[in-house]
Amino acid sequence: MVFRIASSPYTHNQRQTSRIMLLVLLAAVPGIAAQLWFFGWGTLVQILLASVSALLAEALVLKLRKQSVAATLKDNSALLTGLLLAVSIPPLAPWWMVVLGTVFAVIIAKQLYGGLGQNPFNPAMIGYVVLLISFPVQMTSWLPPHEIAVNIPGFIDAIQVIFSGHTTSGGDMNTLRLGIDGISQATPLDTFKTSVRAGHSVEEIMQYPIYSGILAGAGWQWVNLAWLAGGVWLLWQKAIRWHIPLSFLVTLALCATLGWLFSPDTLAAPQIHLLSGATMLGAFFILTDPVTASTTNRGRLIFGALAGLLVWMIRSFGGYPDGVAFAVLLANITVPLIDYYTRPRVYGHRKG
């Protein structure tokens, strides 16, 4: 009798890639709904543009590589890339920006490396960083949330602004953004960094309308809590593991608390860091990408903690208000090293 020795892994999860991607897409619904509520219909338009662009870009590359288009598109990874990029950019950003960022993410950051499972960097964050560096003004032109906004464009006006730059009544992004005590930076992190550099005290800054929320910035706290709810559902469904989100959030909270205690006049309080910007989106939907994150349990804890530290450092001392995208990519660079030194010992072999 001949026994065949199979290669590892000997146990595996029965879920297909398309199933896991679909679970992540479903978990994003609360976060998308919150962004629609607080920032208007532009978010939905950007998601549609990004989704179509991602599918077309992936289909084009697969066709050129003479691979099965239908079979690959069914894994839903292109849709997820487009979605993550779309919810990360301002809702009323010009249409060509989300198309450019999505095409770059799919073709350059994913397919150029060989496709799903081969890319070392998170494609959506690569697309986001390319847009942020190339078009910093447009990428920081967030509308104030509806709680403090003078006017949130309707569906037709959102389409008009995205495709032509003006509403049906002739208004543009500048007129839409201004009107809240003259503050044009419409995110809590933007406002805090700009105001501190202008010499304003933290007490003065916290009186701005953008900080009228119960816990953190107006609107943004609920958006982050919505992404947190989706992330908890992913944990419950066992689509992601707890190591990265927990270590990321604990490290970010710890660094923010220590920084705030030592320098309360220049550094933001921990609740601002935890419930503003892309904190919860990054913790549960971006850092947990199984392709670009660490693959060992100890490695995941280190990877998440490193990302949390980098987010706090970039937000506090860097040139950009929200450092999630840069932190993710910098942490991605360290994954091979982290995995090398956190490999579990093979049973029956000595360590080292």
From Swiss-Prot:
Record bears the keyword Cell cycle: no
GO cellular component, one term: plasma membrane
Cofactor(s) for this UniProt protein: FMN
Annotated TM spans: 20-40, 42-62, 89-109, 123-143, 214-234, 242-262, 267-287, 301-321, 322-342
Listed Pfam families: NQR2_RnfD_RnfE
Entry annotated with the keyword NADP: no
Localization in the cell: Cell inner membrane
Membrane topology: Multi-pass membrane protein
Primary localization class, coarse: membrane
Keyword set, alphabetical order: Cell inner membrane, Cell membrane, Electron transport, Flavoprotein, FMN, Membrane, Phosphoprotein, Translocase, Transmembrane, Transmembrane helix, Transport
Sites of FMN phosphoryl threonine modification: 187
GO biological process, alphabetically ordered: electron transport chain; transmembrane transport
Entry EC number(s): 7.-.-.-
Function, as annotated: Part of a membrane-bound complex that couples electron transfer with translocation of ions across the membrane. Required to maintain the reduced state of SoxR.
Subunit structure: The complex is composed of six subunits: RsxA, RsxB, RsxC, RsxD, RsxE and RsxG.
Similarity comment: family membership: Belongs to the NqrB/RnfD family.
Name assigned to this protein: Ion-translocating oxidoreductase complex subunit D
Source organism: Escherichia coli O81 (strain ED1a)
